[in-house]
Regions:
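Intrinsically disordered, low-complexity regulatory segments
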Residues: 1-171, 247, 251, 479, ...
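Basic, low-complexity terminal or inter-domain segments flanking catalytic cores
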Residues: 2-5, 91, 174, 212, ...
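Amphipathic alpha-helical transducer elements in NTP-driven molecular machines
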Residues: 11-18, 35-42, 61, 77-88, ...
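C-terminal or mid-to-C-terminal helical accessory/interaction module adjacent to the motor/catalytic core
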Residues: 138-223, 280
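C-terminal helical "lid" subdomain and adjoining coupling/linker elements of P-loop NTPases
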Residues: 184-187, 191, 203-257, 302
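C-terminal accessory/connector segments of nucleic-acid motor ATPases
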Residues: 213-236, 271-313, 495, 514-521
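Metal- or metallocofactor-binding catalytic centers and their adjacent structured scaffolds
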Residues: 245-290
Length: 856
């Protein structure tokens, strides 16, 4: 008897499928029934294999471009290798005669599955399971509507094409730019990519507008008028104003001359006014249902959540709790045949026990009672549903959500309810008061019927202006006229919310109508990838977070200058993404051959590499700074060029990116002034390892790294007088001070050293502030520090630094949360295990010495 192998994308999905279909027995990491074998991937198991990374040295132009005749696959990591062995064995079982692709419905899910089958080298009939919800009913219904492999082939072709094109541009572009930047020695990794670089360009261009912005003074005139019923205010405006596209700072209420503004004040003071008033009804519909990008924007604006955090929370609500539909969607509409399911969902939310959604129960009950769920193109529209529909609650009610999960669920549930509520109704009043030939405008907006705004309470209503009444033909008196001097403001920096909007609407920056239409559906990246793109730019040091703002680094300015100077405009313009999305859509619709698309990508790759390889200028043209700090060697003027800060009067110069870390201009100024800077993180050794160091300008005016581990220097007497002690040494009780890259006991330096205590100011890329060292010395433990990076796995981790019994500094980790046990004995075991784990962690904490990764 033959069986069908089902491959899901994640173990949790495989478990849900086994429960929905029933009859399965678990066999280790897979399930089996009379008819099916059920296993899963763990996300992306395979990726396109890159050429060997350099161990020492640098990427060069010698082997570029890299355009393989065929793309090889390799496991992503060791864990992937083990899972692949299982899947290959199951795929090659003789009793497995067919395969069902149950990976996530979309391009990436298709790619994950196709790579696994390709790697296994099997050819068996394939069918496609297209899941839009993880409820058992939805899973069973999807199994009754399996799609054939021929139908899915265009999506598979588009998925492969996207992956291979991204690989070609990313690998070759990154290595070409890295080779160019590493010509003078060292290894300056310069990542570029089809989506990440245009995204970075958007932020860089905004920052340039902010940097070059010059504030302009302007004036407004505000007046207070007396009517029989009371006071009201108005603002002067020019009724003849015409918007000037070349000067967007112009407004009908702005006066650019103080003299002209004062003339209006003088003319209107104490004068009578005539009133003209128009009052009209206004309706405000609720926003559309959430797709992933709009949900990420809302969560960032309301709670400060990063796009990555929101995606993780929404994914957990979909997979683990099963209370939301598939989150990685770019549609804000529902299929027309889901009206009945939506009614049922609304009835669930209206029930007596709606779990986390209980506060919304009265609103859901109103929708049910009024029968507001009915066909409506604002909500149900097949033409606007892509692979997946909008994010909405499922028939399963939420229980035991974390605070963050509950916030995201409530956002979605409220939006879901609001689209079925009537529009909010306002009474909008515009009053024009004419005084001495001048016009003043007063506007009021009064909420008449809250409609959907009732679901949000006061959150969405704001402060409505209730205007005092003015009788017909009543004259008012000008009681007070105020002149306000103001200044124009620069554009706001991007937050994740506004950058997501810019990425989504990047098609507006494209001139070609067909490409703009292609990008109107996806923009830069997809809802599923935008969070990772932003995180990637942060991790590569191109962006940094300050509060909620995203600020480009000096490394970004360096990259923008390079790409502009080399003429590689394909990587900075969203038109490249627009063109690709247009063609990938054509592939999905069988309107374009995959091989034709890949030929075009190969040609583009060759052009990008050629421009970087053949550029023969000494520098790259750009907008460079002149430093205010004089040359430390001769006192001359120091100017920036593409590669260095160089004196215009002598031979002094320093690299702009020692150890692969780009100087901020302010850092260069400090280094020249004080001849010392740091400790700084973000350097990369020739072995590709991150390290921290102090930078110094030597007596010979050369730039040097100081790792704080020079025994010769420590053998000299050190004068700590005038310095503040951070606390007592945990080994000998003497005072601990800051000294170079370390915190040291005063008795651990000098010719008569008697103590060995020292602890790095940077440990595994985590900066240890003086405040935290004081806390460690006084209390025995720091606060929880969140930016350690493992030298083995290169992953971030959190830990406390603790004072050990031998006086050394070690790690202590947060105890892992244990799951609530069903039985009392289980709970006791879990508690015992937790206590033992914590005890072991304290006992076996490894010394946390600073990493010294010298560049020789």
């Amino acid at each position: 008897m033959t069986k069908t192998l089902i491959i899901a994308e994640k173990p949790s999905v495989a478990l849900d499928i086994s429960r929905a279909l029933g009859g399965f027995t678990r066999k280790g990491d897979y399930f089996e029934s009379d008819d099916f074998v059920l296993a899963s991937s763990i996300g992306h198991l395979l990726s396109l294999v890159a050429p060997n990374d350099p161990v020492r040295g640098k990427w060069s132009f010698t082997h570029l471009p890299v355009i393989p005749p065929q793309f090889d696959l390799g496991p992503v990591d060791k864990r992937s290798t083990e899972r692949l062995k299982l899947l290959v064995r199951l795929l090659k079982r003789k009793d497995v005669s067919a395969i069902i692709n149950a990976c996530d419905a979309g391009r990436e899910g298709e790619l994950i599955f196709r790579y696994i089958v390709q790697y296994a080298g099997v050819k068996k009939p394939i069918q496609r399971l297209w899941l839009r919800s993880m409820t058992r009913t939805a899973i069973r219904e999807a199994f009754e509507q399996l799609r054939d492999d021929e139908t899915m082939q265009p999506l598979a072709d588009a998925a492969r094409s996207r992956a291979e094109a991204d690989w070609l541009i990313g690998i070759n572009g990154t290595r070409a730019m890295t080779a160019f930047n590493s010509k003078d020695g060292g290894f300056f990794k310069t990542p570029v990519g089809r989506v990440q670089t245009p995204t970075l360009t958007i932020v860089a261009e905004r920052e340039e507008r902010i940097r070059s912005f010059v504030a302009r003074d302007y004036w407004e005139v505000h007046a207070t008028f007396v009517a029989a019923a009371g006071l009201y205010e108005g603002r002067w405006f020019d009724p003849a104003f015409v918007r000037n596209e070349s000067d967007p700072e112009q407004r009908d209420s702005r006066l650019w001359s103080e003299t002209a503004a004062r003339t209006i004040v003088t003319a209107c003071e104490g004068q009578p006014g005539e009133v003209e008033e128009e009052s009209r009804p206004s309706r405000q519909m609720s926003p559309a249902l959430f797709d992933l990008t709009s949900l990420q924007r809302e969560a960032n604006s309301r709670f400060g959540y990063s796009a990555k955090t929101t995606l993780s929370l929404a994914q957990a609500l979909y997979e683990r709790h099963k209370v939301l539909t598939y989150p990685r969607t770019d549609s804000r509409y529902l299929p027309e045949d889901t009206v009945a399911v939506v009614r049922e969902t609304m009835q669930q939310l209206a029930g007596a026990d709606a779990g986390t959604a209980t506060p919304l129960q009265p609103f859901a009950a109103t929708v049910v009672e009024q029968q507001w769920v009915k066909p409506n193109r604002r909500i149900f529209d097949n033409r606007k549903v892509s692979d997946h529909f909008a994010i909405i609650p499922t028939l399963q009610l939420p229980k035991e959500l974390s605070e963050a999960e509950a916030r995201i669920y409530t956002l979605v549930a409220r939006r879901f309810l609001s689209v079925f509520f009537p529009a909010a109704e306002f009474r909008v009043t515009t009053r024009i008061t004419r005084v001495a030939g001048h016009h003043f405008k007063t506007e009021g907006k009064v909420l008449v019927e809250p409609g959907w705004l009732a679901i949000y309470g006061r959150e969405a209503q704001g402060e409505d202006a209730h205007l005092v009444a003015v009788a017909p033909d009543e004259h008012v008196r000008t009681e007070d006229v105020e002149l306000r001097g103001l200044q124009t403001r620069p554009p706001a920096r991007f937050t994740e919310a506004t950058l997501l909007s810019a990425m989504e609407g990047a098609g507006k920056l494209v001139d070609d109508e067909a490409l703009r239409e292609a990008m109107s559906e996806r923009g830069l990246g997809t809802p599923a990838t935008r969070a990772a793109i932003i995180e990637g730019l942060l991790n590569e040091g191109y962006l940094r977070r300050e509060g909620r703002e995203l600020i480009p680094s000096a490394k970004t300015r360096q990259l923008m200058t390079l790409l502009s100077g080399l003429g590689v405009n394909e990587l900075t313009s969203p038109e490249l993404t627009g063109e690709w999305e247009h063609k990938l859509k054509q592939i999905e619709q069988r309107e374009l051959d995959r091989s034709s698309f890949m030929r075009d990508i190969a040609q583009m790759t060759q052009v990008i590499v050629k421009r970087a390889k053949e550029y023969d200028g000494d520098t790259v043209p750009g907008d460079y700074a002149t430093l205010t700090t004089p040359c430390p060697k001769c006192g001359g003027v120091v100017k920036e060029n593409y590669r260095r800060y160089a004196c215009t009067n002598c031979d002094f110069s320093i690299s702009k990116y020692p150890g692969g870390r780009t100087f901020e201009t302010a850092e260069a100024e400090t280094l020249l002034e004080k001849r010392e800077l740091g400790p700084l993180t973000g350097f990369i050794s020739k072995q590709g390892r991150p390290f921290a160091a102090v930078l110094r300008i030597s007596d010979e005016h050369k730039l040097e790294f100081d790792f704080g581990q020079n025994d010769d220097a420590d053998s000299e007497a050190v004068d700590f007088s005038g310095k503040e002690s951070l606390g007592p040494c945990p080994k000998c009780g003497a005072a601990v001070y800051e000294h170079g890259m370390n915190y040291v006991c005063e008795k651990s330096v000098g010719p008569e050293r008697s103590c060995t205590f020292r602890s790095g100011k940077v440990i595994l890329q985590q900066e240890i502030s003086a405040e935290q060292m004081r806390k460690l010395l006084a209390e025995g433990r720091t606060d929880l520090l969140t930016d350690f990076v493992s030298s083995r796995t290169h992953r971030k981790f959190k830990a406390f630094l603790v004072r050990q019994s031998d006086g050394k500094v070690g790690f202590e980790f947060e105890p892992r949360a244990t799951k609530t046990a069903a039985k009392k004995t289980g709970a006791k075991k879990a508690a015992a295990k937790k206590a033992a784990t914590k005890k072991t962690a304290r006992k076996k904490a490894a010394p946390a010495e600073s990493e010294a990764d010298v560049l020789d």
